[in-house]
């Protein structure tokens, strides 16, 4: 009775304490891993092993597996140790002979448990990688569901996902077959030990060495101990998964970002930034494609404060890469990128990017209201008035559309801005960029994905912004009609600038730029 009461209290305390501790640890661990993901440089996400699906799967599963290590494995270890010590003490007190006979078989019990646990752990690495890949496939399909639906490729992704999940299924079956043998061996040894101890006990009773009561208590205590030790193999699989997850988790926690956002550097107020830009003898290769040079030491560009600088050229020549290096998504292998004569590496990362705003080809809006999306462009801690939001929207040529909506600026845009057209999303993205009051505005083919009517509205907004002055604009343009008024047009080819000048100066050269103009059937006399 006393043993039962103590066990009741002990098991309850164990379950409660370890579950609470595990949940608290998991919450902190997930937050730490997510923070570590956000600190990594952009090149980290270019690697195949670091796709959205793989990372989100790891974020969900690794923390869960480590949680099981804390709640189940650690709790079971404490329980087994406590049970073993208590059981052996009781068994020795009531009859040391039965206890010693049972302990003589302990190497066989431990061997069977080790065999089963080895089988359990042996599949964990392969299974974890297989689950990551299946998560990657699912993430890709769901993320691009509109494209998948438009192309009618649901069947393709269903088959691909089925193949991806088939591997962990096959591994699970192999594991089940082998584990069944290990489990049977483990339990068989335990039962054999119990039978041997009981047989010896009956012989001792016949010889009047012990009485039945002492045999019963001693045998029961030692068998509880043996069963507890035998259970060690049960959580071997949990331990294996948790170990692999812990290794992966601490790899990301301990990984030092190549472009660390927490490093200190120049902290300059935006009002003191002029907006001069320069790229000097840049050499660059993407970390995920080190064998393919983008810039080979010959990329040089200088832009003065207040200028509009346009980069044109064929796809893959490095135009967007230049913008990425200016924002320090990537650092050059060699050469220097400067903002106002300062190497961009000398700025703190947050301060550097606070002087810039980027509007990309595919505008990204978050699942919040229009007003919140625009305010999202301002650094945390800075107060933004509704008037400032509306002024930014007017400058982006989107204010009238917003106030005509039933909920106005409180209208939710949906996931990825799904409730809005491409042109509307782009103009809201421009408003978000403008509310930052940047000294450098970066436009990466901001109109190339729009229809003619939306392009006209967006381009009108961009022209108005440029005409205001007060900032340097670096724009990448596929449609040359949008950059004819730029102060400096640079033609990028094979990783270097082969021509630069105004629209008319480059037309007179009758070389690369003029060929691009003719290719787009642009009226050179316009």
PLM features per residue range, with description:
Residues 161, 249, 279-281:
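Conserved catalytic Walker-motif region of ABC-type ATPase nucleotide-binding domains
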Residues 23, 31-57, 63, 137-160, ...:
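Short intracellular "coupling" helices and adjacent cytoplasmic loop segments at the cytosolic face
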């Amino acid at each position: 009775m006393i043993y039962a009461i103590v066990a009741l209290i002990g098991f309850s305390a164990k379950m409660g304490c370890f579950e609470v501790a595990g949940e608290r640890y998991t919450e902190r661990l997930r937050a730490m891993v997510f923070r570590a993901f956000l600190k990594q440089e952009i090149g980290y996400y270019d690697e195949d092993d670091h796709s959205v699906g793989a990372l989100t799967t790891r974020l969900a599963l690794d923390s869960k597996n480590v949680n099981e290590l804390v709640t189940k494995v650690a709790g079971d270890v404490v329980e087994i140790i406590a049970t073993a010590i208590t059981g052996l003490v009781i068994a020795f007190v009531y009859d040391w002979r039965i206890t010693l006979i049972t302990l003589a078989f302990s190497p066989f019990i431990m061997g069977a448990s080790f065999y089963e646990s080895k089988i359990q752990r042996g599949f964990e690495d392969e299974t974890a990688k297989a689950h990551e890949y299946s998560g990657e496939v699912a993430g890709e399909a769901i993320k691009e569901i509109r494209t998948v639906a438009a192309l009618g490729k649901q069947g393709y992704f269903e088959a691909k996902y089925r193949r991806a999940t088939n591997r962990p299924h096959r591994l699970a079956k192999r594991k089940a077959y082998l584990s069944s043998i290990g489990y049977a061996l483990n339990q068989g040894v335990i039962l054999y030990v119990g039978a041997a101890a009981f047989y010896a006990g009956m012989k001792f009773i016949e010889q009047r060495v012990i009485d039945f009561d002492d045999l019963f208590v001693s045998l029961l205590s030692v068998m509880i101990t043996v069963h507890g030790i035998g259970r060690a193999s049960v959580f071997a699989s949990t331990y294996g998964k948790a170990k692999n997850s812990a290794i992966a988790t601490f790899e990301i926690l301990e990984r030092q970002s190549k472009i660390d956002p927490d490093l200190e550097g120049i902290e300059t107020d935006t009002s003191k930034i002029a907006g001069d830009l320069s790229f000097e003898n840049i050499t660059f290769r993407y970390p995920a494609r080190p064998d393919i040079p983008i810039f080979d030491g010959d990329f040089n560009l200088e832009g003065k404060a207040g200028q509009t600088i346009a980069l044109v050229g064929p796809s893959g020549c490095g135009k967007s890469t230049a913008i990425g290096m200016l924002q320090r998504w990537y650092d050059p292998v060699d050469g220097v990128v400067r903002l106002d004569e300062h190497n961009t590496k000398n700025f703190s990362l947050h301060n550097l990017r606070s002087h810039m705003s980027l509007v990309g080809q595919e505008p990204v809006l978050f699942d919040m209201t229009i007003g919140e999306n625009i305010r999202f462009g301002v650094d945390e801690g800075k107060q933004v008035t509704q008037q400032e939001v509306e002024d930014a929207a007017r400058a982006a040529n989107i204010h009238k559309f917003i106030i005509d909506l039933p909920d106005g600026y409180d209208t939710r845009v949906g996931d990825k801005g799904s409730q809005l057209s491409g042109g509307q999303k782009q103009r809201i993205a421009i408003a978000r960029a403008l509310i930052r009051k940047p000294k450098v505005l970066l436009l990466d083919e901001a109109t190339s994905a729009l229809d003619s009517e939306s392009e006209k509205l967006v381009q009108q907004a961009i022209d108005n912004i440029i005409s205001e002055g007060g900032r340097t604009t670096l724009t990448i343009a596929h449609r040359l009609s949008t950059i004819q008024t730029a102060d400096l047009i640079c033609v990028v080819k094979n990783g270097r600038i082969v021509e630069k000048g105004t629209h008319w100066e480059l037309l007179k050269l009758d070389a690369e730029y003029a060929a691009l103009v003719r290719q787009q059937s642009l009226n050179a006399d316009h």
